[in-house]
């Protein structure tokens, strides 16, 4: 590394305590290029609060380079230089450990939020549930739910007129050029496919293909969305998210190809709270969901080999937590708890530590 003064589009702070902490093996972090600095911040972000914290000047600098290179850290930092509730910020939702979820966050941070709100299209599905509950399984889809009324009609019309320009904010400036961080580059390889059920297209982020869908929902009416502090887009609220999962489980629990992921999502939601009666009522206004839930639980409990397959295919990080949730659901319905395998008794984190 040479000693030539680094030319930058903005001023580098005099001190970079957090960068120096996560780059302890680098004698002078200011000799790193901006892209190298950003890469170190991205890879070391989960050490916030462990190795140290950025100063206010360093936070402003991180935000500047994140915006300049369109990094996923933009969404992590939120709308101001310093995240709200910074004492708890990293411990709760400041960093997604799975790379695919970091890349999903990159896509979310480039969407046209005004368009989503106007169409009442809300982020949901299993990816939302996993990202909200400790990333217990690896989900590679981005699913938005849009009501079957004026919302979906507006969505279809605008997408037909403007294509990707309707869905993405500043579509022409998406991070795909040479100056952008390789891990953050977005490619939209195909045309948008639309029909009466939804619109869909693949998104490639840093070489990883993510399936993007905006689904027309006619079975239930959505309430007001929620805005988690990690999400740059509106999300299904708790009632609607659980109602959607109850409906999805009722539709497809008998199929082994689904790998019981709707039941597993419900189990992890149950760890956080009892299934609200409002969610049950909303789902059952469409069709029966509790009897299929009971049958899905029995099917899952009775087949330990099938459960193992589900854990492997879905990359479940903590099977013991899944069974904790399954047992709560079972007890809610008057069923016995699960006879556990060894894998379901001891946390994988404990085994690997």
Q: Where are the predicted features?
A:
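Short, charged early-sequence alpha-helical segments and their helix-coil boundaries
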Residues: 51-80
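Alpha-helix C-capping/helix-to-loop hinge sites
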Residues: 25-26, 44-48, 145, 249, ...
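Short alpha-helix boundary/capping elements
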Residues: 42-50, 66-73, 271-274, 291-292, ...
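N-terminal acidic leader/helix
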Residues: 3-35
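Compositionally biased terminal segments of proteins
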Residues: 12, 76-353
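Non-catalytic, well-ordered alpha-helical scaffold segments
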Residues: 13-20, 35-39, 56-63, 260-267, ...
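Surface-exposed polar/charged interaction patches
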Residues: 22-25, 29, 44, 68-72, ...
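Amphipathic protein-protein interaction modules
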Residues: 28-53
